[in-house]
Each structure stands twice: as structure tokens, then as C-alpha cells.
Design a protein with these regions (language model features):
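NAD(P)+-binding Rossmann beta1-loop-alpha1 motif at the extreme N-terminus of oxidoreductases
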Residues: 2-72
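Short secondary-structure boundary/capping segments
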Residues: 14, 72-73, 99, 121-122, ...
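Residues at the starts of beta-strands that form the adenosine-phosphate
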Residues: 21, 46, 129, 156, ...
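Rossmann-like NAD(P)-binding element
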Residues: 71-108
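Rossmann-like NAD(P)(H) cofactor-binding subdomain of soluble oxidoreductases
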Residues: 95-145
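Internal alpha-helical scaffold of NAD(P)-dependent oxidoreductase catalytic cores
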Residues: 152-177, 183-184, 190-271
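Interdomain hinge/lid region at the active-site interface
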Residues: 255-323
Length: 331
């Protein structure tokens, strides 16, 4: 494939671009959806994508991107670089940006863990502004074929600015205590609005990123990397591992014929079991210290249920509490 390839035929601009040249590395579900949304929102901006040849050719046929390349050199003039590959690949890509991206740029990622990549980003040259990012808009099935421009509509997009720790410590001295409960952490994250506004006012790059995310339809929220990884261990990583483990147990026990007898409950409960393992291996490896306690908590509940199968007292307590929490779950 000749590189770069420029996609012709753009409609007239509908709103002024926030970034003129949008670089996206990795055109899976998230990267592909960002590309599609950006191309619709800012027709005069260039959407530049880096991936393998097959994915890029598909994206060009879908009119999802303008410039396609299998080499980071195409990002030379990007003013925002979005790393949307698996977590460990994103971390490795940071080392290459200095060589290929020649001008000041906002750099962000879309990975499900934040501590390792934010730590690695501290070695970036000062012309780059790195902000860890995580759009909470995934789906059970990944890949460009499932991308859509409205994927982020109304969804939270978590940001972990490197300047947040000092700002949060001034506003809420106890926000970073490591043994805080998930419920307390949720309260901390929800109350970060004033801090986020202060950060935007003092950081033009962060302000542009907030505007970019809002234009995609998402709701940007800020938190520390520690709070992010602790909360996501329970909100995302534990449900994924649980769904995969449950599907394996059931499949091994009843086989293909038995699965044909299952109702909607099993399908709904194990929807996440279709997720790609390569992405989740990186997530597990970079958040193991937080996922481990979450798994331990689940195992303890399962052991309670196992011991109480005949009596039912503990089972009733667990079902009652679970139903109460389920009613509060945001859909």
C-alpha cells in the first residue's frame, strides 16, 4: 500500500475544528468510533490513522479516515495523537513519539488502566502534553466493524491529568487514601467538577481535550490514576473476568447441546465473554494489584453461598443487597 493515502470527497464543514490534524493509532472499536465521529464533526480536519494494512483499507472503504499509514511517520504534523491500541502497546508507543511527531501535540490514550502509562508518559519531551484517557463506551465485541460515530453519546470519558494530584490534594486532602472503599471513590470522582474546571482554566491543552471529548458526545470527568485503577477493577475488570469464567464453567459442564437449552439469563450474564483476550491480558497485567482484591471479594461471596445452600439465610442477605445495588445501577 502506498503511504499515506488521502481519502477524497469531504462534505462542507459543520463546526470549527478543535484539532486540525487528528492522529489515531489503532482502529479498533474505540479508535474507529473516534475516527468516524471526528470525520463527521470536523470535515476540514484531517483524520490520520495508523494500523495494519487490512484494517486501514477497510477504514478507507468505510470513509472513516482521511490519511492511512502503517508507520508513525504520518503523525509528523498531528496536533493530537490518540493511542487506541492495547494497553502495553500504547505504553511502548510513547517511546516512539519523539522521533515521529515533530510539533507540539496533545497526547492521550484510551486504555482501561492508567498508572503505568501515565508514569511512562512523564519521560515525554515537554512539547507534548499527555493526559491519560479512558472512554467508558466499550462493547462486548471489538474491532473496526463494530465502530460507530455515536458510541460515546452520553458516556463518561475519564481523564487523569498529571497535574490533578496537586489540585485534588488542595481541594480534598483525603481523596487519595489508598484504602478508601469503592463507594467512597465513586463519591470522590463525582465531586471532581470544580477541580476539573480549575485545571481546564490553567491548562489550554486540557481545555481543548475537554472540548474535543464533549463534541464527541461524551462527558469528561477527571480523577487520579490511583482512583481510576481501583474503581475500574470493580466496575469493569471484575465483571469481565467473572463473565469469562462463568461461561467456561457452564460450557465445560453442559457442552454445545446443553447451551441450546439456556434462556436469556445466561446470555445476558455472559455477554462480556466475547471480549478479545489480547486486550484483557494487558489490562490484567497492568492492574493486577487492584483486580486481585476484587476477585478475592467475589470469591468470598461465592464461598458464603456455597456454605449456605441448605440454610439460605446468607443467600437471602446477598440477594437482598444485590437487588438494592442493582436498582441504583446507571443504565
Amino acid at each position: 500500500m502506498e503511504l499515506p493515502v488521502i481519502q477524497p470527497g469531504r462534505p462542507r464543514e459543520t463546526q470549527p475544528p478543535i484539532f486540525e490534524k487528528i492522529g489515531i493509532v489503532g482502529l479498533g472499536l474505540i479508535g474507529g468510533s473516534i475516527a468516524q465521529a471526528a470525520r463527521q464533526l470536523w470535515p476540514t480536519s484531517l483524520v490520520i490513522a495508523v494500523d495494519n494494512k487490512d484494517v486501514l483499507e477497510t477504514a478507507m472503504r468505510m470513509h472513516a479516515i482521511d490519511v492511512a499509514a502503517d508507520d508513525l511517520i504520518v503523525l509528523a504534523e498531528a496536533d493530537i495523537v490518540i493511542l487506541a491500541a492495547p494497553v502495553k502497546q500504547n505504553i511502548a508507543l510513547l517511546d516512539e513519539l519523539d522521533e515521529y511527531v515533530r510539533q507540539p501535540a496533545v497526547v492521550t490514550d484510551t486504555g482501561s488502566t492508567k498508572r503505568e502509562i501515565v508514569a511512562a508518559a512523564r519521560s515525554l519531551p515537554p512539547r507534548f502534553t499527555f493526559v491519560g484517557g479512558h472512554p467508558l463506551a466499550g462493547a462486548a465485541r471489538g474491532g473496526l466493524e463494530h465502530a460507530r460515530p455515536d458510541l460515546f453519546a452520553g458516556r463518561p470519558w475519564l481523564l487523569t491529568p498529571q497535574s490533578l494530584r496537586s489540585a485534588e490534594s488542595l481541594a480534598r486532602p483525603h481523596a487519595s487514601v489508598s484504602h478508601a472503599t469503592p463507594a467512597a471513590n465513586a463519591s470522590t470522582a463525582a465531586s471532581a467538577g470544580p477541580v476539573a474546571r480549575a485545571l481546564q482554566a490553567s491548562d489550554p491543552a486540557l481545555e481543548r481535550l475537554f472540548a474535543f471529548i464533549r463534541a464527541l458526545g461524551a462527558e469528561p470527568r477527571t480523577m487520579t490514576v490511583e482512583t481510576h485503577d481501583r474503581m475500574l477493577a470493580y466496575l469493569s475488570h471484575l465483571p469481565q473476568l467473572t463473565a469469562s469464567a462463568l461461561m467456561q464453567v457452564v460450557g465445560d459442564a453442559v457442552g454445545q447441546d446443553g447451551l441450546g437449552l439456556s434462556g436469556r439469563g445466561l446470555a445476558d450474564t455472559t455477554r462480556l465473554a466475547s471480549s478479545p483476550a489480547d486486550i484483557w491480558k494487558d489490562i490484567a497485567a497492568t492492574n493486577a494489584d487492584q483486580i486481585g482484591p476484587a476477585l478475592d471479594a467475589l470469591i468470598a461471596i461465592l464461598q458464603d453461598l456455597r456454605r449456605d445452600l441448605f440454610e439460605g439465610e446468607r443467600l437471602t442477605e446477598i440477594f437482598t443487597d444485590a437487588a438494592r445495588w442493582r436498582e441504583l445501577l446507571k443504565r
